[in-house]
Amino acid sequence: MPILIAAVVAVGALCLLDLLLTFGVIRRLREHSNVLAGAVDPGMIGVPPGESPGAFSAVTTSGEEVTGTAGLRVVAFLSSSCSACPERVPPFTEYLARHRIGRDSVLAVIAADDGTPPAFLSQLVNVTQACVEPYDGEAATAFKVTGFPAFFLLDADGAVTASGWDPSAMPEPAMA
């Protein structure tokens, strides 16, 4: 009988320990849920539609200076270290051709901390005003870019009308 009593007490103590650990795990999960609730929306890639990006200036690979969004209809942010970026360049150039968006209306910002342009830059220089800047450069900061690739469609006033990770999913641009 004493062995049976000891076994019941041991099982009871083990159940209490398990209950305490479960409460600890639940508390931690609630903390993580609160942290994740405050995280960046995965659909939010930068300046939200309806808002205008901040002021910026960039110098293109051909030496032209682009200041702000005046005259721009599409702005693309690509990265030299992004594995998806080279895959998105052909759909991006097809989007520009399909909607007849001229080179002067498109800015492609390539983020490269070392300043070395990626191989896909050669596909962009004829269809966009392309510039290479650091990841925290003026244009990326003005558009509040949270990841790469990022594509922004702008209206005549320079406000963002749409944004996305995939250029082929972008809506048709408004007439300029």
Model-derived regions: residue spans:
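Short active-site neighborhood of thiol/selenol oxidoreductases, capturing the structured segment around
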Residues: V66-F92, A108-V109
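Structural motif
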Residues: F77-S80, V109-D114, P134, A156
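Long, leucine- and charge-enriched amphipathic alpha-helices
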Residues: M1-V47
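Structural microenvironment flanking redox-active thiols in thiol-disulfide oxidoreductases
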Residues: P91-V125, G137
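N-terminal "domain-start" segment that seeds a small globular fold
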Residues: N34-V66
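Non-catalytic, surface beta->alpha helical segment in thiol-disulfide oxidoreductase systems
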Residues: T146-G147, F152-A176
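Short, internal strand/loop/helix patches
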Residues: S122-A150
